[in-house]
């Protein structure tokens, strides 16, 4: 897979679980300029208080945990990415202030 300098390709997928609990990512593939601000939206439907996760899969590599939050208002952060567990809006949006070509990957929102 070739990447043009200055562009970041993000392919967005989703993971969920059974029993009616689910996560939703509305965006499809996204291409951004380097140093652009990134937001990947993730909303969920669940009973109780699930643990929320962002996973990343870089080209040619396996799935890796990027960050997690286990209770409302927890903020996960790693490698410049952040996401805050918002129970009131049932969201766990992934953000990064300045993306790089090295951020090109597939990003998965999940709950447990």
UniProtKB/Swiss-Prot annotation:
Signal peptide (UniProt feature, chain positions): 1-20
Primary location: membrane
GO cellular component term, pick one: T cell receptor complex
Record's keyword annotation contains Glycoprotein: yes
Keywords: Adaptive immunity, Cell membrane, Disulfide bond, Glycoprotein, Immunity, Immunoglobulin domain, Membrane, Receptor, Signal, T cell receptor
Residue pairs linked by disulfide bridges in the UniProt entry: 42-109
Compartment list: Cell membrane
Ig-like domain mapped to chain residues: 21-112
GO biological process: adaptive immune response
Gene3D superfamilies cross-referenced by the UniProt entry: Immunoglobulins
Residues linked to a glycan: 41
Function, in words: V region of the variable domain of T cell receptor (TR) alpha chain that participates in the antigen recognition. Alpha-beta T cell receptors are antigen specific receptors which are essential to the immune response and are present on the cell surface of T lymphocytes. Recognize peptide-major histocompatibility (MH) (pMH) complexes that are displayed by antigen presenting cells (APC), a prerequisite for efficient T cell adaptive immunity against pathogens.
Subunit (UniProt): Alpha-beta TR is a heterodimer composed of an alpha and beta chain; disulfide-linked. The alpha-beta TR is associated with the transmembrane signaling CD3 coreceptor proteins to form the TR-CD3 (TcR or TCR). The assembly of alpha-beta TR heterodimers with CD3 occurs in the endoplasmic reticulum where a single alpha-beta TR heterodimer associates with one CD3D-CD3E heterodimer, one CD3G-CD3E heterodimer and one CD247 homodimer forming a stable octameric structure. CD3D-CD3E and CD3G-CD3E heterodimers preferentially associate with TR alpha and TR beta chains, respectively.
Protein's UniProt name: T cell receptor alpha variable 9-2
């Amino acid at each position: 897979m070739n990447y043009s300098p200055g562009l970041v390709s993000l392919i967005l997928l989703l993971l969920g679980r059974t029993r009616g609990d689910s996560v939703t990512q509305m965006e499809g593939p996204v291409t951004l300029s380097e140093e652009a601000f990134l937001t990947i939206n993730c909303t969920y439907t669940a009973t109780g208080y699930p643990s929320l996760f962002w996973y990343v899969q870089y080209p040619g590599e396996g799935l890796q945990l990027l960050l997690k939050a286990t209770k409302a208002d927890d903020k996960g952060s790693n490698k410049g990415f952040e996401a805050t567990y918002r129970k009131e809006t049932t969201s766990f949006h992934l953000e990064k202030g300045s993306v790089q070509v090295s951020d090109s990957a597939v990003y998965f929102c999940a709950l447990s």
